[in-house]
């Protein structure tokens, strides 16, 4: 049984931890609002970019001048998985659920006889995936010193991905991230980057498409837009991740604060019981000594 001093020290330690978790919750809540606004603002732009690509692709048709970023290599033997996670922990299962989702995808591709390469964006994803798939990780990018994600960060990743594709290092590229739904809900998501998946984007009807005139030509515009679209989709993923991370962190720190409060109550109760028992024992000894006299 711990002594009164040990219990007192433990209570003080838990109270100090509770102050930290409470402060972290407040910081996460403040950052969440900004991150959520940024993620929600990026969605319409990202979706509209896909619609524009779909419209131009419809106008181009099957022209030979279309970039291979749009059409692909014609094969799907080598897959590059761009896995986006956070740089830090203390955010519940946020990072682990993205890594687990990507890990399951890797296993299914390997089982199908495909070659898999992994590009880790974020420290936590790298730390998780390297244990099982360290040999498959070909590239990694971290933003430890970045306080707020900027488009330049996404563009850096996009340029590396496009460079790898131009060198013939993969056939298909898929982006993994966590889509922010609410403070307690972040959904692991996979989005194909290369070949550009614009089939689901709302394209204009043929009558509406006829009014557009492209200069110098639709194929050239499409070739310029596709690399930017890749950067835009990665930027959206990073913003969604930032909002999801703050939401998960706020929830995790709230749970930790409440758990610390419950532990303090239990330890305080144990401390008071032991202290009362000690006082009672001392009183009995005093009374017994007085009677002996």
Curated annotation (Swiss-Prot):
Q: Tell me a Gene Ontology molecular-function term this record carries.
A: ATP binding
The way this protein sits in the membrane is described as:
Peripheral membrane protein
Any one Gene Ontology cellular component term annotated for this protein = proton-transporting ATP synthase complex
Q: Which Gene3D superfamilies match?
A: 3.40.1380.10, ATP synthase, gamma subunit, helix hairpin domain
Q: Which Pfam families match?
A: ATP-synt
| InterPro entries per the UniProt record, alphabetical | ATP_synth_F1_ATPase_gsu, ATP_synth_F1_gsu, ATP_synth_F1_gsu_CS
Q: What is its main location?
A: membrane
Q: List the disulfide bonds.
A: none
In terms of superkingdom, the source organism counts as Bacteria
Instruction: Read off the PROSITE patterns from this record.
Output: ATPASE_GAMMA
Q: Which subcellular locations apply to this protein? A: Cell inner membrane
Keywords from UniProt, A to Z, are: ATP synthesis, Cell inner membrane, Cell membrane, CF(1), Hydrogen ion transport, Ion transport, Membrane, Transport
What GO biological process terms are annotated to this protein in UniProt?
proton motive force-driven plasma membrane ATP synthesis
Q: What is the role of this chain?
A: Produces ATP from ADP in the presence of a proton gradient across the membrane. The gamma chain is believed to be important in regulating ATPase activity and the flow of protons through the CF(0) complex.
**Quaternary structure note:** F-type ATPases have 2 components, CF(1) - the catalytic core - and CF(0) - the membrane proton channel. CF(1) has five subunits: alpha(3), beta(3), gamma(1), delta(1), epsilon(1). CF(0) has three main subunits: a, b and c.
What family is reported? Belongs to the ATPase gamma chain family.
Question: What name does the UniProt record give this protein?
Answer: ATP synthase gamma chain
Q: Which organism is it from?
A: Allorhizobium ampelinum (strain ATCC BAA-846 / DSM 112012 / S4)
